[in-house]
Amino acid sequence: MSDLSSNRLPNRASRVTNQALSAIERFLHIEALSGIVLLLAAASALIFANSQYAALYESFWHTPLGFNLGHFTLSWDLHFWVNDALMTIFFLVAGMEIRREIHEGALADFKQAILPIVAAIGGVCVPAIIYFIFNFNEGHIHGWAVPTATDIAFALGILALLGKKIPSNLHIILLSLAIIDDIIAVLIIAFFYSTNIDPSGLLIAGGGIALVLFFQWIGLASAWLYILPGAIIWWGLMVTGVHPSLAGVILGMMTPVFPTRTLVAPLTMLSNAMQILQEKNTKTDLHHISTALKKMRKGQRAMIAPVTRIQKALHPWVAYGIMPVFAFANAGVSFANFDLSSGKSFLIVFGVVIGLFVGKPLGIITASYLAVKSGLCRLPPQMTWAGILLIGFLAGIGFTMSIFVSMLAFKDIILLDAAKIGVLCGSGLSALIGLGYGFIYIKRNKDIPHSSE
């Protein structure tokens, strides 16, 4: 019996370590399943916006929500709370994903990261150029960034539908490319869609960043404590004129990638807990059992880096809550007053659709081909040009980020609806072609070792 007890500690530590190492697998599964939820949310929004409940749908998202504290009043409509507040949490998780990939993922080794970096740049430039060509004379070039984004959830969702016969390297490259795409999207939003910059806001945001660094310096590990500096950064960015949701990226990129230092080593905590459980009288002493279990949970928590722990906790909320709510709030485009025969609307729709459906795969495979042929990088094992083309099609699913950018690019409701329709059509075509081509790819590459997910 004592031998069994003595083996529990290393087994426990092993399980904790395995949980940390399999984080990317959990990420892939959550994102893949959330794609279905996102699709249902978007479809529901379209149905509501084009039904007898359209007015109710529209008025609901303009319902004011806020609170009063003495003479201080804070009130915004639900649409603002979703797009500017809830999406901050989405960007927080995105920032943590970027932080982890740079530290220990595919982006940690520059040689390994060259291919997805080059592919992502090509996948941003070509769609932007295509949109620019169609809309240059119409004066709607401000929407050039709409077809440049990739929706990780939808892309991985389609990849999941193809089953386990997809090479693992294809998963990794698509994920890395999408994360780099997120980095580029964040930079685009910060530098091209921020107006009337107020320097005083930078001081406020800088104060929030300084507070984060101070908290980390004195060893505060509780994530709840960082809500205050996060809110200060958010408010500072809004005052500055930069989209406030980018505060999430800043906070995510600052999240520690190493376990927080504790006075007692995590393994010592687990060892002490096991000693308590091994005591003779512990079997019937609920207080001692409870104390031991608390020590175990504390030890387990101390072994996992904050960036991994917080990301794991937030992912289900973002994947199954925030992103579907965002889709339901913003995908509701009414076709009643939309006139596709209008030159302005048509060119916006056409530019976005072709940018996503054609520009994304064209840019990704062209940039990758040039990089490989020039000797800058090489294709990973199990990877073929057919696989790169599949990644290109899936990267054309822009949905969430593309809609987000379109709302920053267009203030006119007619032009905004045109951009959203372009996003929905372009993303839908990319998903269908990607799925169909994916099955062809699997049949033609039966001998290539596949993912073991």
Swiss-Prot record:
It is a multi-pass membrane protein. GO terms for biological process: regulation of pH. It catalyses: Na(+)(in) + 2 H(+)(out) = Na(+)(out) + 2 H(+)(in). InterPro entries: Na/H_antiporter_dom_sf, NhaA. GO terms for cellular component: plasma membrane. One of its GO terms (molecular function) is sodium:proton antiporter activity. It holds the Pfam family Na_H_antiport_1. Belongs to the NhaA Na(+)/H(+) (TC 2.A.33) antiporter family. This is Na(+)/H(+) antiporter NhaA.
